[in-house]
């Protein structure tokens, strides 16, 4: 039997919501129904935007009857904020809270059936956010960043030293109004970048829409913050059910550390994938993970 016509995906609306005085841009997907529905709030990882394969996930979710709000963090994509490409952890966590509040305010949305979905660095953000929001119905954390120290140790020590030097230069310069010192997000092995594992550069480029000019760099000062960010340590406080989608050969967010933090989550499920950090967004790997996520959603937050 085919899908109900009520769940035929509709073209998303381009919407904006306020986060600490600035506007965040988002796609709002709604299933074609008059019924009140759950909503999935979604955002990307390290320097990622809503256009980098998140729409593929949202289209599959809305086809199953879920509304989706897919947003860009401040300073990235179509959202406001200067300087551009400023990756600030505190700001991004504020954006998550603002996005959830906006989602709860929408008509035909059940404010008590809000799911948050994050991937990579965003996969860590949803864990930190859920620890502080007991109203959330569920969490999906995909190939999540959970531990700054472990992720830093996965990097070549020489690269770490170079990045630290650039970060200090950027941070000091920012105090005197200098332009940001930028570092690449992804680069081939041997090059200085936040991600330079063998699969990083080609995998990152595969997320880019055809013909796009999404910047592949961020302000270097972020390096000074990442090692002090441990969203995985908050998992014991999360009350909502959490689905962890773990890439067993993850070169960016070590799976062993993710599994350790996941084990402390009171209500959790773990799905393993024999894929790398970037493979999970495309092809058969994407099909496997999105199928598992839909199964989780249907069981935990069913569409009425």
Task: Give residue ranges: language-model regions.
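Catalytic nucleophile-loop/oxyanion-hole region of alpha/beta-hydrolase
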Residues: 50, 76-111, 115, 283-289
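N-terminal cap/lid segment of alpha/beta-hydrolase-fold proteins
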Residues: 2-35
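Short beta-strand/loop motif that positions the catalytic acidic residue
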Residues: 238, 244-246
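Conserved alpha/beta-hydrolase
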Residues: 60-80
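The serine-hydrolase catalytic nucleophile loop
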Residues: 47-59, 73, 256
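Catalytic active-site module of serine/aspartate enzymes centered on a nucleophile-bearing elbow/loop
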Residues: 273-304
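Conserved alpha/beta-hydrolase "acid-adjacent" motif
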Residues: 251-257
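Alpha/beta-hydrolase-fold enzymes
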Residues: 127-207
